[in-house]
Curated annotation (Swiss-Prot):
GO cellular component, one term: plasma membrane
Keywords on record: Aspartyl protease, Cell membrane, Hydrolase, Membrane, Protease, Transmembrane, Transmembrane helix
Superkingdom, taxonomy of origin: Bacteria
PANTHER family membership: LIPOPROTEIN SIGNAL PEPTIDASE
Topology class, membrane: Multi-pass membrane protein
Subcellular location: Cell membrane
Reaction catalysed by this enzyme: Release of signal peptides from bacterial membrane prolipoproteins. Hydrolyzes -Xaa-Yaa-Zaa-|-(S,diacylglyceryl)Cys-, in which Xaa is hydrophobic (preferably Leu), and Yaa (Ala or Ser) and Zaa (Gly or Ala) have small, neutral side chains
GO terms (BP aspect): proteolysis
InterPro entries listed in its UniProt record: Peptidase_A8
Organism: Staphylococcus haemolyticus (strain JCSC1435)
Descriptive protein name: Lipoprotein signal peptidase
Amino acid sequence: MKKKYYITISLIVAIAILIIDQVTKRIIATTMNIGDSYEVIPNFLNITSHRNNGAAWGILSGKMGFFYIITIVILIVLVLFYIKEAKYNLFMQVAISLLFAGALGNFIDRLVNGEVVDFVDTNIFGYDFPIFNVADSSLTIGVLFIIIALLKDANSKE
């Protein structure tokens, strides 16, 4: 019999991502000055200490009140979506857990520091991609998983 909710797996995913996110940000914040950069893979990956008081790519910079409200709303919506729409679907539940952990990780930064610590600095095919962190990666992967789950669900109904 299929389980309705995979709470243990969902919690393990969310807590693991949250811990990795917060620990890596703490390491960067306490061991590097803003702007310091270390090359990891030449012409591809650097660890660069950066702060962002906006959203992705620095949009809405300095609008912390907005981010507090919207993040709380998003976290509530994710919990409701998990309960109502992700029954019996482990893949969807993991996707929601990734989104929840990513949103919560950056929310903690904004709440505690008034800004988000970013440090993964990539250059992909000559494009200097905006600096990001583990929470941002979790959000991106979570969105991709949601899209895959929705497409798979739509195809199975045809």
